[in-house]
Amino acid sequence: MTHASILILAGEASGDYHAAALVRDIKQRSPHIRILGIGGEKLADAGMELLHHYREINMIGLSGGLATIRNIIAAYRTMKRELRSGRHHLFIPVDFPDVNMRLCRVARTAGLRVCYYISPQVWAWRRGRVRKLAKLVDRMMTIFPFEQELYREACVDAYFVGHTIVRDIPEPIDRAAARKQLNIGDNEYVVALLPGSRPPEVRRMLPMMCEAAEIFAAQFSDTRFVLPLAGGHLEPLVRDIASNYQVNVKLIHGEAASVMAAADCGLVCSGTATLQAALTCMPHAVVYKVDPLTWWIGRRIVEEDVHLAIANMLAIEAEKQGGPIKEIQDAGFQIRCRECGRPLFVPELLQKSATPEELAQWLVSFRTNESLRRAMVRGFHQIRAMLAPPKNGPTAAEIVLGLLESHPSREQ
């Protein structure tokens, strides 16, 4: 369709990141397609017309206030008006299910095709949403392979299209180049500290990490600790916390993937950074801690078989064929979930087990046990292969363009 029009809603930074890659691919194949909606700088740079910035709709909470609520209502009304305008052919909601599932209903009523990109994490909590989505979408494009079968069992036309991060962190990992870029010596032993991207996370995680670094440095004095800042606004907080510990931490603005590529091992707060750590082949432990009430509520909402490290979710899926967990076991190690006892690939130190002593012990293991290191690296290569786009399947852009071709034409 030469003059087709697509609406997109990406309500947070991760959605902006994934959707921008999709828009670039669509524009490369069909530059005349008009794409507009809600997103951020990455989507705008990729060629999407911004109706609103995602910051206007994802800041509700104690700090949001009435102004933010008004912005959310205005953005929602804008999308409803556009969906009902008759000017567009396809709606692509990107994650952000609380808003996007409502807009899917509007799109369906208006006669638009719906192609959901980045599945809501129904495998983690509220699995009943799968049945609702089956009635709302024409296609579901997933970024984790285990999601495709979950949706197809519910009669959703789902396709695993690969994870964007695989394209952004290419193989092979050039550790020497990463170190040169960051001005780190070839012979230095480097530990990466990634305490999260939000101030509350940093306040909880960084003191533990710094104390673990002190313990480790007392045994291995040649260690260099490096911390990539997720944003410049975090620097005063990070410096203030780090100043309380007898350890020198080199701060680097951004460049998280480069820091992990340069590091020998690391400690990582849960989130996207755990995938970056896996794809840069950095042995690491995942650490997370919240207040007891939040943890208690979370354990009753989230499914029992869900783990914070996506690498563990993927490794469990591959367990029957061997996979990353077997690599660890063959190296003589047993990494288990403290909650359910299940064998894991990457250690997860959560709540009571998230102590400086436990963190330091894993850093020691990564440094002193070469068999463990090699097993983890082999497992990371398998994780990458699982996240890569299927060789014989359609790409996300091809799925979108196929839906446009099958849509009844409208006058522009």
Where are these regions (language model features)?
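Nucleotide-activated sugar donor-binding and catalytic core shared by glycosyltransferases
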Residues: M1-Q412
